[in-house]
Regions:
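Transmembrane alpha-helices and adjacent helix-loop boundaries
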Residues: 1-363
Length: 363
């Protein structure tokens, strides 16, 4: 039985969209779900990563290979990036190296943005910290719109294609890389939240005064959490820019990259990475369904169908908060050692300490 090309394209696009949003939603879940930091400026990290892709790799490759000497990268962006892509098509190793190096730089930019965003208000209560992060998210949008040397403002720029060497399989290769990075992020966060550090984050979220009384530096831990989450958000933004092949400032605004991740986390269940996976899948399926059937749905709605997803997802968020605020998969107790392993550990410890006790009794 042959699989139609349309179905393959649908599954591929679905997987890419799902993986990118999952990375960003997981980073938000680390901040809000596990640490209690209401990051209402998630777009800051995402846009920072995307802007890095628009600024960094094209200039580096053009400089290394002497492309576009005497030309302005922003003004002559199309011509320069076209020549850059010709070079990358014949050098897969360099292409992948540039791709990975750009992700590293995007992560570093995300860390700096996270530090700058949280530093002024990290000692304040969660509501004031959330407002500060919201303001920082708005600030990077204004910079992207008006400071043209980065990504040419509202006109946008093309970005180098590190997967052009794959030919017709370009999008399949992109999907493999993005899904692979998404799995690494998920694995890292699962290990983190199951560790003593994860239990400490929950303790800070539940009662920071008690945590401070036990000697925990709540301010520093919150700051580190925001920085780590911003690194992940920036990597997600960079992957989105590479996938699109170009970047424009208007693509990175708070509805898509702050509101939607919040919907995902609330829908799936905060402080539960599997819940975020389910929420991301439900969100992606809903968005893809509306995108593919807009024309068929248009006669049944009394307004422009482009606003349908905003309306329905907003209603879904309200209903979830009213009737199931814990999300589809509620938070579960932190996994520790299994009963079998714990019993084995206790027996081994008691066996070691018994000879010592007997030796003391002899004397």
């Amino acid at each position: 039985m042959e699989v139609s090309a349309g179905l393959i394209i649908f599954v591929r696009d679905f997987a890419i969209f799902f993986a990118i949003y999952l990375i960003i939603a997981l980073s938000l879940n680390l901040e809000y779900g596990y640490t209690g930091v209401p990051d209402f400026g998630k777009v800051l990290a995402v846009a920072g990563g995307a802007f890095t892709v628009g600024f960094f790799p094209g200039r580096i490759i053009a400089w290394l290979f002497g492309i576009g000497s005497g030309l302005d990268y922003i003004t002559d962006n199309t011509a320069i990036v076209t020549d850059v892509n010709k070079v990358l098509m014949g050098t897969p190793a360099i292409s992948i190296a540039i791709f990975l190096a750009t992700l590293v730089v995007a992560g570093a930019i995300g860390a700096v943005l996270g530090l700058v965003a949280c530093y002024p208000a990290i000692r304040l209560r969660e509501d004031y910290l959330g407002m500060t992060l919201l303001a920082m998210g708005e600030a990077i949008q204004v910079i992207g719109y008006n400071y043209t040397p980065i990504i040419k403002g509202n006109l946008g720029v093309l970005v180098p294609d590190p997967f052009g060497w794959a030919g017709n399989l370009r999008y399949a290769v992109i999907a493999v890389f993005i899904i692979g990075i998404c799995l690494l992020v998920f694995y890292y966060l699962e290990r983190l939240v199951r560790s003593p550090l994860g239990r400490m984050l929950r303790a800070i979220r539940d009662n920071e005064n008690v945590s401070e009384s036990l000697g925990k530096d709540v301010t520093r831990i919150r700051m580190k959490t925001i920085i780590v989450a911003s690194i992940m958000g920036s990597i997600g933004g960079a992957l989105d820019a590479f996938k699109a092949g170009g970047i424009i400032a208007t693509s990175y605004q708070r509805v898509s990259w702050t509101f939607w991740p919040w919907v995902i986390v609330v829908l799936g269940g905060s402080a539960n990475n599997m819940g975020v996976v389910v929420g991301t899948f439900a969100f992606t399926a809903f968005r893809r369904f509306i995108d593919y059937y807009k024309e068929q749905l248009a006669p049944f709605v009394p307004f422009n169908v482009v606003w349908l997803d905003l309306l329905l997802l907003g209603m879904m968020l309200i209903l979830i908060q009213m009737y199931r605020p814990e999300g589809i998969i509620p938070e579960k107790p932190t996994p520790t050692l299994s009963h079998k392993r714990l019993k084995k550990f206790i027996i081994s410890k008691s066996a070691v300490s018994r000879p010592e006790k007997e030796e003391k009794e002899l004397f």
